[in-house]
Amino acid sequence: MKVVFLKDVPGRGKTGDIKEVNDGYARNYLIPNKLAMPASAAVKSEIAAKQAAEERRKAKAEAEMVELAKNLDGAKVNLKAKTGAKDKLYGQITTTVIAAEIEKQTGKTIDKRKLELAEPIRQLGNYEVVIRFNKDLSSKINLAVTAEENT
């Protein structure tokens, strides 16, 4: 019997797969537990439509990511921080702070986990921050850390 898997079943199939399984296994286990349903022409076309929509969504997300990488590559971000003696910062600049500052200055939302620092930022100066969108796509921004004005 051909079934369409509604959920992942280890060793049998993943969600959306259409596979041939034993009739008894399908009728007694998969279908009653709502892990699969019999594969009919309507179900097959519905699954194909869902997969096509998912592919379009992934392609659109990839295109947006590439556009964002192009826009941010080489961007200059200025960050003001409180300092103590000898231009040392109170604490350090984290990826959370950098991501918030990028969003504030450019309007582009970046996940803090995508930011890579060569070293912790504990002093004033210019730093290069890598934004790794995926294994093949990355951008570099220039981060200028300056002293906050005391008022």
UniProtKB/Swiss-Prot annotation:
Described function: Binds to the 23S rRNA.
Biological process per Gene Ontology, one example term: translation
Protein name (database record): Large ribosomal subunit protein bL9
Any one annotated GO CC term: ribosome
Protein family (similarity comment): Belongs to the bacterial ribosomal protein bL9 family.
Highest taxon in the source lineage: Bacteria
Record's keyword terms, sorted: Ribonucleoprotein, Ribosomal protein, RNA-binding, rRNA-binding
PANTHER family in alphabetical order: 50S RIBOSOMAL PROTEIN L9 (PTHR21368)
Gene Ontology MF annotations: rRNA binding; structural constituent of ribosome
Pfam families associated with the record: Ribosomal_L9_C, Ribosomal_L9_N
